[in-house]
Design a protein with these regions (language model features):
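A contiguous, mid-protein "functional segment" used to position or interact
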Residues: 412-414
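N-terminal cofactor/phosphate-binding cores enriched in small/glycine residues
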Residues: 1-8, 12-14
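Signature for the C-terminal beta-barrel architecture of outer-membrane proteins
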Residues: 1, 33-373, 377, 383-399, ...
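Acidic, small-polar-rich N-terminal luminal/periplasmic segments of exported/outer-membrane proteins
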Residues: 1, 18-24, 30-32
């Protein structure tokens, strides 16, 4: 990326390529995640203005990046935030009102222009976002309503002759509410989200993860362990599957509750070195009827609890249990894959320079590929070297081993790693966003540096 920027106390102007987002990103997010192959930076200009701490204004114009180049799609938008708590000098509370407006213009492809115009579909899509943020005495509340504009989709019933309309027009919208409490070692966060036709593409015609112009992460527990990530949840943002079923799902509705508690040292349960407990429950359904909050078919349900305990100054353990229910048909029917997952993560520090970490995992299931077991051993020679080896074995069905060994070296701000192994087809996830990874056996080499 490249840019030139000028900033003073109240104004800033940026010209070039830049990243930004409106609100939570449901309406717009220009960002980069190299693990997922996402980089939809905007090439254009951005202007910001701040009036004391009372008001923040931002206007952008740009062409999103897709793949290795910038597209002809044009994005224009503005964002405004008003801090009522600063205006009225509320020292013990925070209250802000925010709003955004966005317009995306994508020129019709040759050969489609006339048909789309006759169907009443326009090249410009206009959206908006309204938000409120409040905090007082450790409690917080966030609310957002997004209207992402009119979308068009190919009508699966047109090809079968059941409909004379070649295209379907849908209104995209989303609602997000988060509330919680943090204080005295306790953290509670409850979220509700409803998504309906929230797919927002940079360019029509491509279903790649990197083609999205907004940010819609999975709002559920995010796992890093091998077996707990066999079926990660990816949100439903509107799906049409043509074919024998001509299945159509407008989105999802659901939420999660996340609870954390830190038992203090020398308390009854904390013991000599304390104890940390974390639990999460999340559930999501299809939308039974468009334009309503009525839930339909179960898509995903997860319950997990993990406990972290330091036994000695050198030995620490983390123990996880997860119950996952996953619908592999995207809600076409009520089939569910159920898994019970157990993980022990043990870390021992032999000296200031040498530590080892051992993961032992087991997945029990009567569905899909049945039972799995996995183990990982990691040896760290601080601060430069790290080596690891792992094996994930499907002993309940295919009897296949998925092994991996690797080595990394870190110096200053640069990390070089080399790994070799067999990888199953699945998903690679980062920050609640996932993309499909093909099965392969081979080597991976990476260099990560910061300037």
């Amino acid at each position: 990326n490249f840019y030139a920027s000028w900033t003073d106390d109240s104004f800033s102007i940026t010209a070039g390529s830049f990243y930004d987002q409106f609100g939570s990103g449901l309406l717009l997010r220009a960002w980069e995640d190299r693990a997922l192959g996402i980089n939809n930076a905007l090439l254009g200009a951005r202007f910001t203005y701040n009036y004391k701490s009372y008001l923040r204004f931002k206007a952008i114009w740009g062409q999103p990046r897709f793949g290795m180049g910038y597209t002809s799609t044009q994005v224009r938008g503005a964002d405004l935030a008003l801090s009522l708590s600063d205006i009225f000098r509320w020292d013990s509370a925070l209250l802000s009102l925010e709003g955004s407006a966005l317009s995306k213009y994508e020129k019709f492809a040759e050969g489609e222009s006339l048909e789309l115009q006759e169907a009443g579909i326009k090249p410009a899509t206009n959206g908006y976002s309204l938000r409120v943020n409040a905090e007082v005495a450790g409690f917080f509340l966030k609310g957002e309503y997004v209207g992402s504009g009119k979308k068009h989709f190919t009508n699966p019933y047109y090809a079968t002759g059941e409909s004379s309309k070649r295209y379907l027009k849908k209104d995209g919208n989303a609602q997000l509410i988060e509330l919680g409490y943090n204080g005295y070692g306790l953290g509670v966060n409850a979220s509700f989200r409803r998504l309906e036709w929230m797919e927002s593409k940079i360019q029509s015609g491509s279903n790649l993860t990197s083609n999205l112009m907004n940010y819609v992460p999975g709002m559920c527990a995010q796992y890093t362990y091998l077996l707990s990530n066999l079926h990660p949840y990816s949100p439903e943002i509107g799906r049409i599957i043509p074919g024998a079923s001509n299945f159509m799902n407008s989105g999802e509705i659901g939420g999660q509750i996340d609870v954390f508690y830190n038992f203090r040292k020398r308390s009854a349960l904390g013991g000599k070195r304390g104890l940390k407990i974390h639990g999460n429950f999340s559930t999501y359904y299809t939308i039974a009827e468009e334009g309503t909050v009525k839930g339909g078919t179960l898509l995903y349900r997860n319950f997990n609890v993990d406990v972290e305990k330091r036994f000695t100054s050198k030995f620490k353990g983390q123990f996880l249990y997860s119950l996952q229910e996953y619908n592999p048909t995207y809600g076409m029917d009520d089939e569910m894959l159920v898994s019970n997952i157990f993980v022990a993560d043990l870390l021992y520090k032999w000296s200031d320079d040498l530590s080892t970490r051992l993961e032992l995992q087991y997945l029990a299931s009567k569905d899909d590929s049945k039972d799995w077991m996995a183990a990982l051993l990691e040896v760290n020679f601080a601060p430069k070297w790290s080596a690891w080896g792992s094996d994930m074995y499907n002993h309940g069905d295919s009897k296949t081993h998925y092994y991996n060994v690797g080595l990394s070296y870190t110096k200053s701000r640069t990390r070089v790693s080399l790994g070799y192994g067999r990888y199953r087809q699945g998903f690679l996830c980062s920050g609640g966003v996932c993309r499909v990874m093909p099965a392969y056996t081979g080597a991976n080499f990476s260099v990560l540096t910061s300037f």
